[in-house]
C-alpha cells in the first residue's frame, strides 16, 4: 500500500454554512469530476474520492485500471449465507478502498432479482428481501469498520437494464414496501451506511431522485436516516425538483443540472436558501466523516497472503452442490490416472460479471488451473474446449500483436480532425485538453498469424469505427450501425468478418475510430457516459461438430470427466438484460453428448443468475454450481471437488427450468416506457413453493434428527437442531441451515422470510 494521504485540519460545518458564499455552497452539491467531490479550499474542505465495484474496488479508470482484489459476485457471497464471512469480506473491501485512495465505496447493490434475465442480478444478494438486507448489512459493517463509507444502492427497484433511465416501475404499495424497500430498510437500520444512491428509473410515475415522498418522507422522516443521498452517475434529471426532494449530491462532475441552473432556481425562489443549506450540510457531514479514512495518497495495490486465503474461502464456501446421486464426490486425487477437463468455462477464468463489476484483478485462477494444481504428478489431463460460449469475439491479446515500434500491443493516436484532413496533428493522450467531444483516433498493429485457417474478427463501438486488414476494409461499423449491448448498452452490435490467415505471415491491422458523438444510434432510456469506446476481437473459427467429437473422445478415455460450462461477463452485465435463459447454443449439445458417453461426468456450471438446464437437467448425476468466483475461483472449485472443503452453499435464487415458469415471464422489460410488477409480493421462491430457493446438498449427506423452535420473551425465535452425517472425511466442514419464517391462518395472504447462518464444525465432519 502506498503512502498515507495526509489529513487536513477539521472544519466547522456551522461556520461554513454561515460564511460561505452562494456559489461555494452550490459547488458542493455536484461532483468535482467523475470520482471526486468538490473541495472548498477557503474553509479547508477537501475533495474526497469515491470508487465503484460490487466485487472489488476498481479505482478511477474504466479500462486498464490499477489491479485489485476481486471477490465473488453478490449472489455468490449470498450463497454462503454467512454473515460473519460477509463482514470479513467487507473488511477486505474497505482495505482495498484505502489502498486505492478511495474514501467511499459505491456498494452494495440490494435490488431484488425479480427476473433471472436482469443484467445486474449477479451484483445483488438474494431474491428474498430479508436475507438480502441482513447480508448487505454485514458487508457494510465490515467495510465501514476500516473507516471507509459504504453507499447502499440503487434506491429502489432498479432491477432491469432495459431503458433503465426512463422506465416506470409500477407496483402496489405492499409490493414496494415488503419486497423492494425492505432490503434497504433492514440494511440501513442494522449497519448505518454513510450514503444512499438513488436509482435511474421511475417508481409509480416519478424518478426516485426527485421524489419528495420517497427521499424526504420515507427515507428521512419515516426511517429517520440522516446520511447523504447521492444520484447514480448521470441519474439527476432536474434542478429544483431533485434538490427539494432531498437529493444532496449530483454525480458525476462537472455538473449538468446544478451550478448556474441551481443559482437561477434559488434566485427565482424555486429552491429556498434553507433547503440549500440542508443539502450542503449533508455533503459536508459526508466529507467530514470520509476524510478520516487513512487512504493512500496514490492508487496502489495490497495483494497479501491473508487476503488470498480469505478470497479462497469465499470462493469455496459459495459453491453449491446440486446433485451427488452417485456419491462420486469428493474425488480422491491419489486414485486417478486420467482426467478429462472439458468445456468453454474450464480454461476461462470467469471471475466477475460485466459493467461496473469489471476490473483488473491481481491475478485469476481458472477451473483448469485450480484442478490441475491439486492433481498428483503423472495424472494424464485431457483438455478439450468442446464448444464456444462467448457473446463477443475474444479480445485481441497484447501478445498476439505488436506496435509499429515493435512493442507488444496496439498503438493509438488521437486527433481533433477526421482522416480526410491532410497533415493531422497528433494529440498526446485521451484526456488532452485540445480534444473536443468529437475526436478521432487511429489504432494500428502488426498481427503474426498464430495458425493457418479461417479467423473471425469482431468490432463493436460506441461512436463509429472501421477495421482494415492490409489496407483492405473488412468491417464497416460507421456507414450503417445496428444497436447492440456494447458499452453499457450505448454501443453497436458487434460486426464480424471472416478472413483466411496463413501461420507466421504478417498482417497490418488498422482501426479508424471516431468518438461517441459520431454514433448514428438513438437509444432511449440508456445512460450516456460520454467519450467513446471500442472492442476489437479475433478468434480462430472452430467447427462445432468436430469440437464436440474431440470432447466426446476425451471423455471416453478418462477415468473422470469434469465438464465446465456456463456464462461469463459477456452474458451478464450492466447495460443490458438477457433476452433468454439459455446457455450458448453449442453448450447444450456438448453437455448431452458428453453425458451420453460418460454418464457419471461431473458437471460444473458457472453464472451469476439462473439459466436453463434443459435438456440435460435430469441426465446429470453430479452437479456443482459456482458463481463469478473472484481471484480464487479455480482454487475454490478444486477445494470442493477434492474434499478440502465441504460444499455448504445454498442457492439464494430460484433456478426455474424455463423462463416461462417464472413469475415475471409476462412483465419484464420496458413496454412503452413502463413495466408492471404483476407478481406483486410473490417474487421467486414465494411463488415457486415446490422449488425452495436454498436448495442444495452436502457431500457429507447430513440430515436433521431433532428440531426445536422456541419463541422467546423478547419476540425473537431460537431454533435448535441436531445434525448427523453419513460420511466423514478430513477437510473444512460446515452447514448453512435455512429457516423460513411466516404466519399461518391469515386473512391476508402472507409470504415467508428467509434467513440462514453457516455453522462450522472444525476439521472433521460430525458423525
UniProtKB/Swiss-Prot annotation:
Region (Disordered): 727-767
One GO term of the biological process aspect: glucan catabolic process
Compartments in which it is found: Secreted
Known catalytic reactions: Hydrolysis of terminal, non-reducing beta-D-glucosyl residues with release of beta-D-glucose
Cellular component GO terms held in the UniProt record: extracellular region
Documented EC number(s): 3.2.1.21
List of catalytic residues: 232
Compositionally biased residues, Polar residues: 743-757
EC primary class: hydrolase
Source species, domain of life: Eukaryota
Residues of the PA14 domain: 405-552
Involved pathway(s): Glycan metabolism; cellulose degradation
Pfam families for the chain: Glyco_hydro_3, Glyco_hydro_3_C, PA14
Glycosylation sites: 19, 324, 477, 749
GO terms of molecular function: beta-glucosidase activity
Keyword annotations from UniProtKB, A to Z: Carbohydrate metabolism, Cellulose degradation, Glycoprotein, Glycosidase, Hydrolase, Polysaccharide degradation, Secreted
InterPro entries hit by this protein: Cellulose_deg_GH3, Glyco_hydro_3_AS, Glyco_hydro_3_C, Glyco_hydro_3_C_sf, Glyco_hydro_3_N, Glyco_hydro_3_N_sf, Glycoside_hydrolase_SF, PA14/GLEYA
Record-stated family: Belongs to the glycosyl hydrolase 3 family.
Record's function text: Beta-glucosidases are one of a number of cellulolytic enzymes involved in the degradation of cellulosic biomass. Catalyzes the last step releasing glucose from the inhibitory cellobiose.
Protein name: Probable beta-glucosidase K
Amino acid at each position: 500500500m502506498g503512502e498515507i494521504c495526509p489529513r487536513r485540519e477539521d472544519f466547522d460545518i456551522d461556520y461554513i454554512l454561515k460564511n460561505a458564499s452562494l456559489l461555494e455552497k452550490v459547488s458542493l452539491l455536484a461532483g468535482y469530476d467523475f470520482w471526486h467531490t468538490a473541495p472548498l479550499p477557503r474553509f479547508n474542505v477537501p475533495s474526497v474520492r469515491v470508487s465503484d465495484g460490487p466485487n472489488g474496488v476498481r479505482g478511477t479508470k474504466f479500462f486498464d485500471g490499477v489491479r485489485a482484489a476481486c471477490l465473488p459476485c453478490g449472489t455468490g457471497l449470498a450463497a454462503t449465507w454467512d454473515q460473519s464471512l460477509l463482514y470479513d469480506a467487507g473488511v477486505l473491501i474497505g482495505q482495498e478502498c484505502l489502498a486505492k485512495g478511495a474514501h467511499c465505496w459505491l456498494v452494495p447493490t440490494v435490488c431484488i432479482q425479480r427476473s433471472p434475465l436482469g443484467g445486474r442480478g449477479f451484483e445483488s444478494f438474494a431474491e428474498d428481501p430479508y436475507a438480502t438486507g441482513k447480508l448487505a448489512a454485514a458487508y457494510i459493517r465490515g467495510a465501514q469498520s476500516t473507516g471507509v463509507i459504504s453507499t447502499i444502492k440503487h434506491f429502489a427497484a432498479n432491477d432491469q437494464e432495459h431503458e433503465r433511465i426512463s422506465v416506470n416501475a409500477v407496483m402496489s404499495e405492499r409490493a414496494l414496501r415488503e419486497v423492494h424497500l425492505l432490503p434497504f430498510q433492514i440494511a440501513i437500520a442494522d449497519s448505518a451506511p454513510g450514503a444512499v444512491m438513488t436509482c435511474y428509473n421511475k417508481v409509480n410515475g416519478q424518478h426516485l431522485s426527485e421524489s419528495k415522498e420517497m427521499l424526504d418522507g420515507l427515507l428521512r422522516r419515516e426511517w429517520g436516516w440522516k446520511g447523504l443521498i447521492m444520484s447514480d452517475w448521470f441519474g439527476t434529471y432536474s434542478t429544483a425538483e431533485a434538490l427539494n426532494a432531498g437529493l444532496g449530491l449530483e454525480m458525476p462532475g462537472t455538473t449538468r443540472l446544478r451550478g448556474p441552473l441551481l443559482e437561477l432556481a434559488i434566485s427565482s425562489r424555486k429552491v429556498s436558501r434553507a433547503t440549500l443549506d440542508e443539502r450542503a450540510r449533508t455533503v459536508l457531514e459526508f466529507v467530514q466523516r470520509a476524510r478520516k479514512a487513512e487512504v493512500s495518497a496514490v492508487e496502489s495495490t495490497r495483494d497479501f497472503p491473508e487476503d488470498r486465503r480469505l478470497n479462497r474461502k469465499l470462493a469455496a464456501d459459495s459453491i453449491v452442490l446440486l446433485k451427488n446421486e452417485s456419491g462420486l464426490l469428493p474425488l480422491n486425487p491419489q486414485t486417478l490416472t486420467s482426467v478429462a477437463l472439458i468445456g468453454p468455462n474450464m480454461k476461462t477464468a470467469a471471475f466477475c460479471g460485466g459493467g461496473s463489476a469489471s476490473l483488473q484483478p491481481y491475478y485469476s485462477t481458472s477451473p483448469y488451473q485450480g484442478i490441475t494444481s491439486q492433481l498428483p504428478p503423472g495424472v494424464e489431463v485431457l483438455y478439450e474446449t468442446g464448444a464456444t460460449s462467448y457473446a463477443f469475439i475474444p479480445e485481441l491479446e497484447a501478445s498476439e500483436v505488436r506496435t509499429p515500434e515493435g512493442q507488444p500491443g496496439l498503438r493509438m493516436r488521437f486527433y481533433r480532425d477526421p482522416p480526410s484532413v491532410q497533415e493531422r496533428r497528433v494529440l498526446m493522450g485521451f484526456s488532452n485538453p485540445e480534444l473536443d467531444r468529437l475526436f478521432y483516433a487511429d489504432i494500428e498493429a502488426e498481427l503474426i498469424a498464430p495458425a493457418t485457417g479461417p479467423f473471425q474478427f469482431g468490432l463493436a463501438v460506441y461512436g463509429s469505427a472501421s477495421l482494415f486488414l492490409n489496407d483492405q476494409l473488412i468491417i464497416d461499423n460507421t456507414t450503417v450501425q445496428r444497436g447492440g449491448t456494447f458499452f453499457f448498452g450505448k454501443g453497436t452490435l458487434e460486426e464480424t468478418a471472416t478472413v483466411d490467415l496463413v501461420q507466421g505471415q504478417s498482417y497490418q491491422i488498422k482501426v479508424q475510430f471516431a468518438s461517441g458523438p459520431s454514433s448514428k444510434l438513438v437509444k432511449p432510456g440508456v445512460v450516456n457516459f460520454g467519450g467513446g469506446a471500442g472492442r476489437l476481437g479475433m478468434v480462430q473459427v472452430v467447427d462445432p461438430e468436430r469440437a464436440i467429437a474431440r470432447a466426446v473422445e476425451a471423455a471416453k478415455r478418462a477415468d473422470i470427466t469434469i465438464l465446465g460450462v456456463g456464462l461469463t461477463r459477456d452474458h451478464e452485465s450492466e447495460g443490458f438484460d438477457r433476452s433468454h435463459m439459455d446457455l450458448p447454443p453449442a453448450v447444450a449439445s456438448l453437455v448431452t453428448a458428453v453425458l451420453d458417453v460418460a454418464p457419471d461426468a461431473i458437471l460444473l456450471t458457472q453464472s451469476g443468475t439462473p439459466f436453463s438446464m434443459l435438456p440435460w437437467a435430469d441426465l446429470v448425476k453430479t452437479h456443482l454450481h459456482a458463481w463469478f468466483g473472484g481471484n480464487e475461483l479455480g482454487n475454490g472449485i478444486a477445494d470442493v471437488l477434492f474434499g478440502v472443503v465441504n460444499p455448504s452453499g445454498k442457492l439464494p435464487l430460484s433456478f426455474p427450468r424455463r423462463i416461462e415458469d417464472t413469475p415475471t415471464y409476462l412483465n419484464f422489460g420496458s413496454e412503452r416506457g413502463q413495466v408492471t410488477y404483476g407478481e406483486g409480493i410473490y417474487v421467486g421462491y414465494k411463488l415457486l413453493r415446490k422449488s425452495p430457493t436454498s436448495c442444495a446438498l452436502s457431500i457429507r449427506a447430513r440430515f436433521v434428527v431433532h428440531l426445536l423452535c422456541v419463541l422467546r420473551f423478547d419476540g425473537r425465535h431460537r431454533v435448535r437442531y441436531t445434525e448427523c452425517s453419513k460420511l466423514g472425511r478430513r477437510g473444512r466442514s460446515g452447514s448453512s441451515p435455512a429457516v423460513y419464517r411466516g404466519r399461518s391462518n391469515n386473512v391476508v395472504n402472507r409470504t415467508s422470510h428467509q434467513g440462514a447462518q453457516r455453522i462450522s464444525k472444525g476439521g472433521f465432519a460430525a458423525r
